[in-house]
Amino acid sequence: MINRSAIVHPSSIIEEGAIIHSDVHVGPFCFIGAQVEIGARTLLKSHIVVNGITQIGEDNQIYQFASLGEVNQDLKYAKEPTRIEIGNYNQIRESVTIHRGTVQGGQVTKIGNSNLFMINVHIAHDCIIGNNCIMANNVTLGGHVKVDDYTIIGGMTAVHQFCLVGSHVMIGGCSGVVQDIPPFIIAQGNHATQFGLNIEGLKRRGFSRSAVHAIRDAYKILYRSNKTVEGAKVALKLLSTEHPIINEFVDFLTRSQRGIIR
């Protein structure tokens, strides 16, 4: 179903069954598969493939040569009905690839709202991306990677499969991430390691002075106290009773499976 207010260039192919909502603009030479749904006011520039079971929200901008919802690169994939979900207000720049999920990973690759994926970003199967993230040119995420809100990943960085990246993290360009990165941290290198806190980012996002001081204390517990991760977790839980923001560290350490960068 194509809404009457949608604009579709005559050179584009939209298979029967696709749902195109109001004021969507599909530019020239695009292909949209039968199981795709595209939300209102989303713009597809040109030469874009959207395939598989793919749901795209409202007010997204998708640039030329992007490929969304294609078969993933997991050799175990056997044509199961897995999918991708993309939220609202995302900018997906040239040649970005986002692959559908696998049955082993929850069946969905999921993108939140208001993210910017620059040229040639690759988001593999089963990745879960939060809101307000920025991934610079040529960032590559392996399968099952989770990236929390307000994370910035520098260009040419690769993130190993199953890694977890916390909220408000900044990763420098050309890094190789092989372990989990706790929230609020600046990381860089191959293999990536911690280089302090993303203080400037926290200030820009309105964190109070007391919250920033508490986060500094949490960083010292995690990285300068010679505690084990479990020992640090106990100390962080105690600190969180006075400063609830520290629960982000506690929750992250609970979720972490690959160990944290240290």
Swiss-Prot record:
<protein>
    <recommendedName>
        <fullName>Acyl-[acyl-carrier-protein]--UDP-N-acetylglucosamine O-acyltransferase</fullName>
        <ecNumber>2.3.1.129</ecNumber>
    </recommendedName>
</protein>
<keyword id="KW-0443">Lipid metabolism</keyword>
<dbReference type="InterPro" id="IPR010137">
    <property type="entry name" value="Lipid_A_LpxA"/>
</dbReference>
<dbReference type="InterPro" id="IPR018357">
    <property type="entry name" value="Hexapep_transf_CS"/>
</dbReference>
<dbReference type="InterPro" id="IPR001451">
    <property type="entry name" value="Hexapep"/>
</dbReference>
<dbReference type="GO" id="GO:0016020">
    <property type="term" value="C:membrane"/>
</dbReference>
<comment type="function">
    <text>Involved in the biosynthesis of lipid A, a phosphorylated glycolipid that anchors the lipopolysaccharide to the outer membrane of the cell.</text>
</comment>
<keyword id="KW-0963">Cytoplasm</keyword>
<dbReference type="GO" id="GO:0008780">
    <property type="term" value="F:acyl-[acyl-carrier-protein]-UDP-N-acetylglucosamine O-acyltransferase activity"/>
</dbReference>
<dbReference type="InterPro" id="IPR029098">
    <property type="entry name" value="Acetyltransf_C"/>
</dbReference>
<keyword id="KW-0012">Acyltransferase</keyword>
<keyword id="KW-0808">Transferase</keyword>
<keyword id="KW-0677">Repeat</keyword>
<dbReference type="InterPro" id="IPR037157">
    <property type="entry name" value="Acetyltransf_C_sf"/>
</dbReference>
<dbReference type="Pfam" id="PF00132">
    <property type="entry name" value="Hexapep"/>
</dbReference>
<comment type="subunit">
    <text>Homotrimer.</text>
</comment>
<keyword id="KW-0444">Lipid biosynthesis</keyword>
<comment type="pathway">
    <text>Glycolipid biosynthesis; lipid IV(A) biosynthesis; lipid IV(A) from (3R)-3-hydroxytetradecanoyl-[acyl-carrier-protein] and UDP-N-acetyl-alpha-D-glucosamine: step 1/6.</text>
</comment>
<comment type="similarity">
    <text>Belongs to the transferase hexapeptide repeat family. LpxA subfamily.</text>
</comment>
<dbReference type="GO" id="GO:0005737">
    <property type="term" value="C:cytoplasm"/>
</dbReference>
<keyword id="KW-0441">Lipid A biosynthesis</keyword>
<dbReference type="InterPro" id="IPR011004">
    <property type="entry name" value="Trimer_LpxA-like_sf"/>
</dbReference>
<dbReference type="Pfam" id="PF13720">
    <property type="entry name" value="Acetyltransf_11"/>
</dbReference>
<dbReference type="GO" id="GO:0009245">
    <property type="term" value="P:lipid A biosynthetic process"/>
</dbReference>
